[in-house]
Design a protein with these regions (language model features):
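Blade/loop signatures of beta-propeller domains
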Residues: 43-64, 82
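Beta-strand-rich domains and repeat architectures in extracellular enzymes and scaffolds
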Residues: 59-93
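A flexible loop/linker signature enriched in serine peptidases of the S9 family
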Residues: 68-69, 87-93, 106-112, 125-157, ...
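Short coil/turn segments that connect the beta-strands within blades of beta-propeller domains
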Residues: 80-82, 120-122, 165-167, 226-228, ...
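Beta-strand-rich domain onsets/edges
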Residues: 349-366, 375
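C-terminal functional module detector
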Residues: 373-392, 398-401, 408-419, 425, ...
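Catalytic cores of extracellular degradative/oxidative enzymes
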Residues: 468-652, 656, 661-663, 684-686
Length: 865
């Protein structure tokens, strides 16, 4: 191998002085033109996989293959046992289990996964993902490496598996109406040889199921050796989970003759595989969600008791019997990233199958990327967006390949990254949070050579120097995804995204409690915190009816149960209320707030009250400290303005709800809260004190300072009885263009300022007359078309209120009080219709809390009169 060394200093986005950087600036402009004119895989439609009418992001992560995975995924044995086919780097590979040597078998413009080897060893069927819109079926001839397209339409296809004699292919499709059904179709020499047979059909459960929808799913077919029956996973007649394992004949609508062989709550991970004698199935399970991690189990195919084969404190996914039944190949995330592993069926020996070398079928080179802080010269962690010459994304083998909430494909780097890439021009964008200019650049990859790039990210500003420290209020470490995440990795990603405080939340997924083992009593920062970055481990309490909430600073124990209102469980009742649980958390010293409260731009009162139905109750009772934005949107302003208009000082905060062990999820810190701690600096208590005091602004990218007579958000300006004038000042900076500044007084827009020149910065100064008590806040917005590289629909930031008190008059609004009363009336109507109450006493207790909140708002109405 040869090395070519290049040192590139990238321009700041929006930099005005190009006289000394003409060559580099020209390179960047060329890069932008190329990105604008070349189709790039991985930019899905506005909704990922639109032909799938249910399932959502959880299903996309737990069931759909990663597109791509930087490490092996979805093993399938060759019939002679000499090779294991896997998905890796967007292609199908065959791996020698003795040496770890991997040979690329399939390649085209799509991301390939879910391989299944034909019984004669000549063909591998697999899925082909176009980057988030459809998933199709293809088949490759192992000897000639010629690819045949099997499907090409708007639907989703998954789980291809050859029949024991190779004459048929079973698979899952969203045909005809967007719901997941199993089909079988004859196949011969890599081509269809007849019409498909629908083994299942669309079927309604009769009502919406929590996280799993109204319509049944039929997934993961596995052939019985006789070729006349299938096992599959279906949630037909199942209220919770992705379904049971059922056994059914391979005939049209065989689902009508199905028998259940495994009855347990599952989460898309089962992946049953039948032994060569047809007597047993091996599968991945959390034992009805009793375990935190997925382990391997065996059970009779006729039904019976499961037997646990592994006892890991990590996950074991996608098990597949070897042809002789002596080994099980599976995917292990013991060391973080998914890796190929083997388990001896009789004896229990375990082997991690390292990929010793990748033999690509096309010319490849290596990119070595080194990143540093442009101001200090020190190495720094970053986020990397990469599009290779073939329009696809590639990630280093030691990095987790991710798809952001907006559909960008990225990886995080600690400061050095090494990735194999196809020959040609690679386009990169290197990002470090909101306070550094992104660096855009291109490089040429040459076959057999190493291209070394050193990139500096230059600071836009330093908010900490002004007393502002940022952190998302909603981060999850592990949540049943493919990665076995760690606190260290969470801190690394937060470094790459440049957030100062990392607020990790322990949470339930159905009956499982993820990350409970990292809770440390005492209510303080976690011991791995550093002077540069604080880690706080809190809890997300997740009742689907009232709305999910955060609890940070619990001094003694986690709040249990972790949810209410789960159908068919012993916690189906809506008692206790969020009010009750807030009070219990506050008794432990916690700061609490509603999370991912409201999405979109419409008033939640016109719909089903959004994701924080209990907000207006707890705002009135003083039991919630905060309400969270989890994406760019305006819907939350309707209820929050109603609260602020009656002096209820609930703090608006930002937390994206990143689930960072999922491969497709919002990025850590993509929606965050900036808190002003002043001279106290970066310290946990100071940050949460500032949060509760409202010294905060929310941002998906723009940076804001806003004062009224020198008072910052959360503070009060006192004026005499006759009122007076106040001086408003605003300062805005942004790594992406901003379009407008919106000034709001008591919930009404009083001025909108368009930013027309240097759209990366704005300043505003106004002198305004005030005659009554109220509040000001500032909103900043950009255009959706200019959001990149932010992981948000558009650039948005807004401050909490600066309060104005005229004389001794409180802030009051009869209109907002009436709005709040209508909200609670609607909430109570929904609660009255809930079927899971256990007793009249429980209902009366909760409804009395609703009535106490009504009394508060009625009092505001009287006060405003």
């Amino acid at each position: 191998m040869y090395s070519r060394i290049g040192r590139i200093r990238c321009p700041k986005w929006g930099h005005r002085d190009s006289s000394q950087r003409f060559g580099t600036m020209f390179l960047t402009l060329v890069c932008a033109a190329v990105l604008g004119s070349t189709p790039v895989l991985g930019q899905p439609s506005s909704r990922p996989y639109p032909s799938a009418r249910h399932g959502g992001n959880y299903m996309h992560n737990y069931y759909f293959p990663p597109a791509p995975s930087s490490t092996p995924w979805a093993p399938s044995w060759s019939p002679d046992g000499r090779w294991i086919a896997v998905a890796m780097n967007g292609s199908i590979w065959k791996v020698d289990p003795d040496t770890g040597l991997a040979h690329e078998i399939s390649y085209n413009k799509k991301y390939h996964s879910a391989p299944d080897w034909s019984p004669d060893g000549q063909w591998i069927a697999y899925t082909a993902d176009d980057g988030g819109t459809t998933i199709q079926l293809e088949v490759v001839n192992v000897n000639t490496q010629r690819v045949h397209t099997l499907t090409s339409d708007e639907f989703i296809y998954t789980d291809p598996v050859f029949s024991p004699d190779g004459s048929q292919l079973a698979y899952v499709s969203t045909k005809p109406n967007g719901h997941f059904n199993v089909y079988v179709r004859p196949i011969l020499n890599g081509q269809w040889a007849g019409d498909e047979i629908a083994i299942t059909k669309d079927n309604s459960f009769g009502r919406d199921r929590l996280y799993f929808g109204e319509w049944d799913m039929h997934l993961m077919p596995a052939w019985m050796p006789n070729g006349r029956e299938l096992l599959l996973v279906s949630n037909r007649d199942v209220p919770l989970g992705s379904g049971n394992v059922i056994r059914l004949p391979v005939i049209p609508l065989g689902i009508e003759e199905a028998e259940t062989v495994l009855d347990e709550q599952t989460l898309y991970r089962t992946r049953p595989d039948v032994s060569i004698d047809g007597k047993r199935l091996v599968y991945s399970s959390t034992s009805g969600t009793a375990d935190q991690f997925s382990n391997l189990y065996v059970q009779p195919t006729s039904g019976g008791e499961p037997y646990k084969m592994t006892f890991f404190n990590h996950d074991a996914f996608h098990p597949r019997w070897s042809p002789d039944g002596e080994w099980v190949a599976y995917v292990s995330n013991a060391n973080g990233l998914p890796q190929l592993a083997l388990l001896e069926t009789y004896g229990g020996a375990q082997r991690r199958l390292e990929i010793s070398d990748r033999r690509w079928k096309r010319p490849m080179g290596i990119l070595s990327l080194n990143t540093h802080d442009g101001a200090t010269g020190e190495a720094t962690a970053v986020r990397v967006h990469l599009t290779a010459s073939d329009g696809k994304f590639y990630a280093p083998t030691n990095a987790y390949a991710r798809v952001t909430g907006e559909g960008d494909r990225i990886f995080h780097s600690r400061g050095t990254a090494r990735v194999e890439l196809p020959v040609g021009t690679v386009n990169l964008t290197v990002v470090k949070g909101f306070e550094f200019w992104p660096a855009k650049l291109t490089a040429e990859i040459t076959a057999g050579e190493v291209t070394i790039l050193t990139v500096g990210v230059d600071p836009l500003t330093d908010m900490a120097a002004k007393g502002w420290y940022s952190g998302s209020t909603h981060v999850h470490m592990n949540y049943a995804g493919n990665l076995h995440n760690t606190l260290d990795n969470l801190m690394m990603m937060s470094d790459a995204e440049d957030q100062d405080i990392v607020n990790e939340q322990i949470a339930n997924k159905d009956n499982r409690i993820l990350d409970h083992h990292v809770f440390v009593p005492g209510g303080g920062a976690h011991p791995i915190s550093t002077p540069e970055r604080i880690l706080v481990v809190g809890q997300e309490y997740r009742p689907p009816f009232y709305g999910h909430v955060f609890m940070f600073g619990l001094e003694d124990h986690l709040i249990s149960p972790f949810t209410t209102g789960y159908e068919g469980t012993a916690i189906e009742s809506l008692y206790p209320s969020n009010t009750d649980m807030f009070l219990k958390a506050k008794a432990q010293g916690a700061t609490v707030g509603y999370v991912h409260a409201f999405f979109g731009n419409s008033d939640p009162l016109e719909g089903a009250l959004g994701g924080a139905k209990g907000f207006m109750v707890d705002a009135a009772l003083g039991t919630t400290d905060a309400v969270e934005w989890s994406g760019a949107g305006r819907a939350g302003f309707f209820p929050v303005y109603a609260a602020w208009n009656n002096g209820l000082r609930v703090t608006a905060v930002g937390g994206e709800d990143s689930i960072s062990n999922l491969h497709a999820s919002k990025l850590v810190g993509s929606v965050r809260t900036y808190i002003h701690t002043g001279e106290r600096g970066l310290e946990m208590d100071a940050w949460f004190d500032g949060l509760r005091a409202g010294h905060a602004f929310v941002s998906t990218g723009p940076l804001v300072e806003f004062t009224v007579d020198g008072a910052i958000p959360g503070e009060t300006v006192n004026l005499p009885e006759e009122g007076g004038t106040v001086e408003l000042r605003a300062w805005v900076r942004s790594i992406t263009p901003i379009e407008r500044l919106i000034l709001v007084w008591n919930g009404k827009v009083i001025e909108e300022v368009l930013v027309e020149e240097n759209r990366h910065e704005a300043e505003l100064s106004r002198t305004l007359s005030v005659s009554g008590s109220g509040w000001y806040h500032l909103r900043v917005e950009g255009r959706t078309s200019e959001r990149f590289p932010l992981d948000a629909d558009f650039a948005q930031a807004f401050t909490n209120p600066v309060w104005i008190t005229v004389g001794d008059h409180p802030v009051r609004s009869q209109e907002s009080a009436a709005y709040s009363l209508r909200w609670i009336d609607k909430l109570q109507g929904m609660a009255e219709a809930w079927p899971g109450w256990r007793s009249v006493r429980e209902r009366l207790h909760v409804f009395e809390q609703f009535e106490q909140a009504r009394k508060v708002y009625r009092g505001f109405t009287e006060g405003s009169q």
